[in-house]
Regions:
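Active-site helix/loop of acyl-thioester processing domains in fatty-acid/polyketide metabolism
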Residues: 1-32, 110-112, 119-138
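HotDog/MaoC-like acyl-thioester-processing domains
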Residues: 1-6, 14-92, 149-179
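Generic alpha-helix signal with a bias toward terminal, lower-confidence helices
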Residues: 73, 107, 115, 132, ...
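A contiguous, surface-exposed recognition patch within enzymatic or periplasmic domains that forms
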Residues: 85-119
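Short linear sequence motifs
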Residues: 96-99, 138, 160
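A conserved acidic, glycine/proline-rich C-terminal tail/linker
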Residues: 133-156
Length: 179
């Protein structure tokens, strides 16, 4: 996941200045020998970028599609509704500003929302952490990001039938459907 995020940062920088990750689809099946980016959609307030990694034989080894949006309102100003948590607690983690800074330095994700005193945890940083935490060498995920997670927030991951749900307190922040 981290090498896909690193390659994603090679995309045109205008897609990273204040834009937020609304969703992602990741397929990781084997190591990749070569990686390439492709902008599939570039509109005023939304963009889709694909990162594909080819295996030595030329087949698709891994792929990441990200759905980026430029919010109309400042992040964190829209009230979020608490909800009943479903599923069994799988794992939890509190991201530090140093972890976010390390991720940004490694991937090259220079988005301003991941910097400052109270940065937002990058969505792909959380996905990469979860992949490592679950010791997954292969995966097929569709991730929908619902609300931001900030440095210092305790992120709790719950497993339900066919999906993982992430919460900060009783606020659902993202859902991963296992494809």
């Amino acid at each position: 996941m981290l090498e896909l995020a690193h390659k994603l940062a090679d995309s045109d920088a205008k897609f990273f200045g204040g834009w937020v990750l609304a969703g992602a689809e990741a397929h990781i099946h084997q190591p990749a020998e070569a990686m390439a980016n492709q902008v599939l959609l570039a509109k005023e307030r939304k963009s889709i970028i694909r990162v594909a990694g080819a295996a030595a034989d030329g087949s698709l080894a891994k792929e990441l599609r990200v759905f980026l949006v430029l919010p109309k309102h400042k992040l964190g100003t829209k009230p979020l509704e608490p909800e009943a948590i479903k599923g069994d607690l799988l794992t939890k983690h509190t991201f530090t500003t140093q972890e976010i800074a390390d991720y940004v330095a490694y991937t090259g994700d220079e988005n301003v929302i991941h910097k400052g005193e109270h940065p937002i945890v990058p969505g792909l940083c959380m996905a990469a952490w979860l992949q490592r935490e679950l010791a997954l060498e292969t995966l097929d995920w569709r991730i929908t990001f619902v609300a931001p997670v900030y440095a210092g927030d305790e992120l709790c991951i719950y497993r339900t039938e066919g999906q993982l749900a992430a919460y900060v307190g009783t606020i659902n922040v993202f859902v991963i459907k296992e494809l």
